């Protein structure tokens, strides 16, 4: 999908870019695959703020996505490529031969009319989903399961991809976008190809209001707050942090501090860590 550049007719339009939506073939979603998406504004069930900088934005409906791809052996035809406001990637509507309809994440190169299949016997073709043990070494994949049958959890955002590096016993070595090489059970499933809409990271939002449309509220620096609001706050004019390292609003070390648990059970499955 190409990037569209706007003319600088206003200060907000200057340097603003957006998607041209050339791949989108339908603007009306499948009603049977929609679910309500109540506004949370970053609050939990007690009404307490748990995620900052959330609130407002355009009303949305959730598109029910098939991350499990467990309908084996029944061919499906791509009916439409659609925009999804809840994720960076586009989605594709599949019409199965038995009449069922499902949404999937649209990989790069998937077009309307293409036939896709799930299952161990599926061909190595963009959009097909099969167990990792049936995928050749060197294949580019996305939507990877971590537990068999749970559904894809890794490599789902726009332009993301991973690669099968090798096979060792009941595990398959997969190199992720971060450079991390990880062992994943060979019975876990993955989809062939790279996630589409790879130009998404090049979009320049251009103005603050466009973030508000997405439900993102302003981020205020801690150094301009009062001492009771943030560890960096207070002082006369611009002052240093006054602590050994930068702190989060709750007094925890941040900006470089490792947060992964040292006794994480999945540590033994990581062959090589991510790039620094």
Curated annotation (Swiss-Prot):
Chain's role? One of the primary rRNA binding proteins. Required for association of the 30S and 50S subunits to form the 70S ribosome, for tRNA binding and peptide bond formation. It has been suggested to have peptidyltransferase activity; this is somewhat controversial. Makes several contacts with the 16S rRNA in the 70S ribosome.
Biased segments, Basic residues type: 255-276
GO MF annotation terms: rRNA binding; structural constituent of ribosome; transferase activity
Report the Gene3D superfamilies cross-referenced here. 2.30.30.30, Nucleic acid-binding proteins (2.40.50.140), Ribosomal protein L2, domain 3 (4.10.950.10)
Specify the species. Macrococcus caseolyticus (strain JCSC5402) (Macrococcoides caseolyticum)
Q: Which HAMAP family match?
A: Ribosomal_uL2_B
* Oligomer status and interactors: Part of the 50S ribosomal subunit. Forms a bridge to the 30S subunit in the 70S ribosome.
Cellular component, GO, one term: large ribosomal subunit
SUPFAM superfamilies for this protein: Nucleic acid-binding proteins, Translation proteins SH3-like domain
The record, for Pfam families, names: Ribosomal_L2 (PF00181), Ribosomal_L2_C (PF03947)
Q: What is this protein called?
A: Large ribosomal subunit protein uL2
Q: Which GO terms describe its biological process?
A: cytoplasmic translation
* Family membership noted in the UniProt record: Belongs to the universal ribosomal protein uL2 family.
- The UniProt annotation puts the region (Disordered) at 36-55, 219-276
Q: Does the keyword Ribonucleoprotein apply?
A: yes
Which UniProt keywords are given for this protein, alphabetically ordered? Ribonucleoprotein, Ribosomal protein, RNA-binding, rRNA-binding
């Amino acid at each position: 999908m190409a990037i569209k550049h706007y003319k600088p007719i206003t200060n907000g339009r200057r340097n603003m870019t957006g998607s041209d939506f050339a791949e989108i073939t339908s603007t009306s979603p499948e009603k049977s695959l929609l679910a309500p998406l109540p506004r949370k504004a970053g609050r939990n069930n007690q009404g307490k703020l748990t995620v900052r900088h959330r609130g407002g934005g355009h009303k949305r409906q959730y598109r029910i996505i098939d991350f499990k791809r467990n309908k084996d052996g029944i061919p499906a035809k791509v009916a439409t490529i659609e925009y999804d406001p809840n994720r960076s990637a586009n989605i594709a509507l599949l019409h199965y031969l038995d009449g069922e309809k499902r949404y999937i994440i649209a990989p790069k190169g998937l077009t309307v009319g293409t036939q896709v299949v799930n299952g161990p016997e599926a061909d190595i073709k963009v959009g097909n989903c099969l167990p990792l043990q049936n995928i050749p070494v060197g294949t580019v994949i996305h939507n990877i399961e971590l537990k068999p049958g749970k559904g894809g959890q890794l490599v789902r955002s726009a332009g993301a991809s991973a690669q099968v590096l090798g096979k060792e016993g009941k595990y398959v070595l997969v190199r992720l976008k971060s450079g991390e090489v990880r062992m994943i059970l060979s019975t876990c499933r993955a989809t062939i190809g790279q996630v589409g809409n790879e130009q998404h990271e090049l979009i320049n939002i251009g103005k603050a209001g466009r973030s508000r449309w997405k439900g993102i509220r302003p981020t205020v620096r801690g150094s301009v707050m009062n001492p009771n609001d943030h560890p960096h706050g207070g002082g006369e004019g611009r002052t240093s942090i006054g602590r050994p390292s930068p702190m989060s609003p709750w007094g925890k070390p941040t900006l470089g501090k490792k947060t992964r648990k040292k006794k994480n059970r999945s540590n033994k499955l990581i062959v090589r860590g991510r790039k620094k």
